[in-house]
Amino acid sequence: MALVSADSRIAELLAELQRLLGHTQEERSRSEHNLINIQKTHERMQTENKISPYYRTKLRGLYTTAKADAEAECNILRKALDKIAEIKSLLEERRIAAKIAGIYSDAEPPRKTMRRGVLMTLLQQSAMTLPLWIGKPGDKPPPLCGAMPAAGDYVAKPGDKVAARVKAVDGDEQWILAEVVSYSHAANKYEVDDIDEEGKERHTLSRRRVIPLPQWKANPETDPEALFQREQLVLALYPQTTCFYRALIHAPPQRPQDDYSVLFEDTSYADGYSPPLNVAQRYVVACKETKKK
């Protein structure tokens, strides 16, 4: 029943999103006439080689209108982004509900483990579709935007992806990509599933062994302070794996769609680090350990 309700709400939100996008285009078309007038006014001023009081007053009015038009379009786009965020949240809730129903249903046969190639593709898609933080002028990037840490009292929700420190079969500890199943406030412990095992291996971990992944990408052009900087020590997901390893930032992203360039610690190289490898913002988190000597 909950799944049907979610589907109905998603359909409503998609219709609202389509309406908002239509309004965006209308707003843009309406403001285009004003922008053309600004351009023509500047051309006339260049032809006459003077800035008369008339042109100064006219331009002031045109720019005031252009600013108001841009703000109106911006407000519509922000509403559209809110709808997209709500749709993604509902899709995630539906996925978790379906997963729980699958776990506790005896009527259906157990699902097969996901093929590794499919899993890697899903992880790449998750990184690509991570929303970009777009704040209003003067807004500071929130916790879990890029390199910004979670608030001290933050508790990851079921379904959230995290870096989790677990004991491997050989007894060594490693950081893995995991999904939160639950959190016990009484015990201050998480239950997480290893992503690579499709829920077959579950770990109970203290909060200090769990690092929430970013929920927004930071925009290097507007919020560079929300990115890890060159030579900063991090934990990064090694490409084509589901494990996090210590690495140094070689270069932060330059554009919103860019990845980090990182140097993984690797004793097989003379300087102790691998050649630069690209890792998405989604899979780079702070490392609390000290840099190796």
From Swiss-Prot:
Ranges for domain SGF29 C-terminal: 152-293
Gene Ontology cellular-component terms listed: ATAC complex; nucleus; SAGA complex; SAGA-type complex
Domain of life: Eukaryota
Entry-linked PROSITE patterns: SGF29_C
The entry's keywords: Chromatin regulator, Coiled coil, Nucleus, Transcription, Transcription regulation
Residues of the signal peptide: none
Intracellular or extracellular location(s): Nucleus
Coiled-coil intervals: 12-88
Biological processes annotated in GO: transcription initiation-coupled chromatin remodeling
Annotated region (Histone H3K4me3 binding), positions in chain: 264-266
Pfam families: SGF29_Tudor (PF07039)
Domain text: The SGF29 C-terminal (also named tudor-like) domain mediates binding to methylated 'Lys-4' of histone H3 (H3K4me).
Function statement: Chromatin reader component of some histone acetyltransferase (HAT) SAGA-type complexes like the TFTC-HAT, ATAC or STAGA complexes. SGF29 specifically recognizes and binds methylated 'Lys-4' of histone H3 (H3K4me), with a preference for trimethylated form (H3K4me3). In the SAGA-type complexes, SGF29 is required to recruit complexes to H3K4me. Also binds non-histone proteins that are methylated on Lys residues.
Family: Belongs to the SGF29 family.
Subunit annotation: Interacts with dimethylated and trimethylated 'Lys-4' of histone H3 (H3K4me2 and H3K4me3), with a preference for the trimethylated form (H3K4me3). Component of some SAGA-type complexes. Component of the ADA2A-containing complex (ATAC).
Protein name per its UniProtKB record: SAGA-associated factor 29
Organismal lineage: Eukaryota, Metazoa, Chordata, Craniata, Vertebrata
